Design a protein with these regions (language model features):
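Nucleic-acid endonuclease domains
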Residues: 1-71, 77-253
Length: 253
């Protein structure tokens, strides 16, 4: 057995029980075979095509599989040349009525006549909303805040809550990257890089957020009765920088 494979297996103690009881070593072998096979046509058009394709090639029906001690190991994949960002996790801000306040103050009319707000925030400067100064992220001592131009806090997340949310969502991750070419139904992928990631590095997460590398997407809509609907307030990062959120990074392909 390859010493590299052996050491990784010993370190991670990772076994997959996917459909046909695929073991970690067998999965690693399959990934190498997929890499050697070269370009593969997408199994689905659109942004989710890469995930569907690698799941089919690996024989996985969903994007997470049992990992160590029966804990879930999430499978994520990304195009190396992707311009779109990857969602780390979604979490509505506090207090409970924060979205209602933000929508009332900064929302605009959607095509259906109801209010909505789709905008991206960073921790470097206030964004622009309809030509006016909008919102900004502030990394405070104990929490992360959504603030106005006048430093009014409209919503926030406790740091401890965010840390636990990330650790629960992505405690361990298999991250597969692919070159891509073509578009639509003719898009092709070459899956040629894979990582095992674990140990959420919260301090680095805060540094990336402060530096504007991690962004916050606000997606608020409105029900017919006027109540706000959070479509997913997400913390997002460029796919090629996801590894920076983890303290233990092991390249396996």
């Amino acid at each position: 057995m390859d010493k590299r494979v052996s050491s990784i297996e010993s370190l991670i103690n990772l076994r997959f029980h996917v459909l046909s009881m695929l073991t970690y070593v067998e999965l690693l072998k399959k990934l190498k075979e997929i890499k050697s096979s070269g370009w593969v046509k997408t199994h689905r058009t659109g942004n989710t095509g890469i995930g569907k394709t690698i799941e089919d090639l690996l024989g996985i029906k969903e994007n997470n599989v049992p990992g160590p001690d029966a804990e879930k190991l999430e499978l994520k994949s990304a195009r190396k040349n992707a311009k779109s960002m990857l969602t780390l996790f979604t979490k509505s801000p506090l207090p409970p009525k924060a979205n209602a306040v933000i929508l009332a103050r900064f929302g605009y009319a959607a095509e259906n006549g109801r209010k909505e707000l789709h905008t991206t925030l960073n921790a470097i400067s206030h964004n622009l909303l309809r030509g006016c100064t909008g919102l900004k992220i502030k990394v405070d001592h104990s929490r992360i805040e959504i603030i106005t131009e006048n430093s009014e806090v409209l919503g926030y997340w406790d740091k401890d809550t965010l840390k636990k949310t990330f650790e629960r969502k992505l405690p361990r991750l298999m991250y597969i990257k692919a070159e891509s070419q073509g578009s639509g139904k003719n898009e092709e992928f070459w899956f040629n890089e894979a990582w095992l990631l674990q140990g959420f590095d919260f301090e680095n997460f805060l540094k990336l957020l402060t530096a504007g590398v991690i962004l916050v997407d606000i997606r608020i809509g409105q029900y017919p009765n006027g109540k706000p609907h959070d479509h997913g307030t997400g913390f997002r990062i460029q796919p090629n920088q996801l590894e920076l959120c983890f303290s233990k990074r092991e390249q396996i392909l």
